[in-house]
């Protein structure tokens, strides 16, 4: 993520990115390392590229101190983002993960603010849809079982789970709903036809 953040902090790239998001109805998605970059840039949770302090959220080493690669359940906690327009709050999806540094950390005050603002978009959950801290549920030990967050306007979304690693014919012998479609085709298509 360090290379990605260095690239985006270039003034021309930074200005073009902010123009895309603020003036041209653009969307941005970061998955796994991309999520790490979005956090280190400030795009999530703040919606702007800005300097980061020790008090800002971060993604750090999993609590079990090793890489995890498996399937987990995540629940939609907020669908205010155009990226999640095809989902309902409470929907549960099975998502592949593969990371060693996926634990979302921030202050209790900030995580409550994110929840109150509807910026926590997905959480790791058990088979009943309940967020938890057990490693079998929350593979990295993220505070409040956070798997993904978004910017205040929902245009920027970051998540750890690899929704893009799901395709027809995969995971045939594993129960779960895999059809999350994080990219809102409906939103993108509506935008395209309005031009």
Give names to the regions the model predicted.
Residues 1-80:
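Cysteine-nucleophile active-site neighborhood
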Residues 30-32, 96-98, 160:
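Short beta-strand segments
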Residues 35, 100-102, 163-165:
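Glycine-rich beta-alpha junction loops
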Residues 38-39, 84-85, 105-106, 158-159, ...:
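Short helix/loop capping segments that flank catalytic or ligand/cofactor-binding pockets
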Residues 68-152:
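Catalytic beta-strand/loop cores that center a nucleophilic Ser/Cys/Thr
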Residues 146-174:
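A glycine-centered loop/beta-turn motif at secondary-structure junctions
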Residues 186-193:
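Conserved small/polar residues in nucleotide/adenosyl-binding loops
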């Amino acid at each position: 993520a360090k290379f990605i953040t260095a690239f985006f902090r270039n003034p021309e790239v930074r200005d073009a990115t902010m123009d895309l998001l603020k003036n041209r109805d653009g969307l941005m998605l970061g998955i796994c390392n991309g999520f790490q970059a979005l956090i280190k840039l400030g795009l999530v949770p703040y919606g702007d590229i800005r300097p980061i302090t020790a008090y800002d959220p971060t993604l750090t080493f999993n609590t079990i101190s090793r890489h995890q690669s498996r399937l987990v359940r995540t629940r939609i906690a907020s669908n205010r983002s155009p990226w999640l327009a095809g989902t309902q709050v409470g929907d549960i999806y099975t998502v592949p993960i593969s990371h060693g540094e996926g634990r979302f950390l921030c202050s209790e005050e900030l995580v409550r603010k994110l929840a109150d603002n509807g910026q926590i978009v997905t959480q790791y959950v058990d088979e009943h849809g309940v967020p938890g801290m057990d490693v079998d549920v929350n593979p990295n030990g993220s505070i409040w079982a956070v798997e993904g967050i978004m910017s205040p306007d929902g245009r920027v979304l970051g998540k750890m789970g690899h929704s893009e690693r799901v395709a027809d014919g995969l995971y045939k012998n594993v129960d779960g709903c895999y059809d999350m479609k994080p990219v809102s085709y409906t939103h993108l298509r509506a935008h395209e036809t309005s031009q």
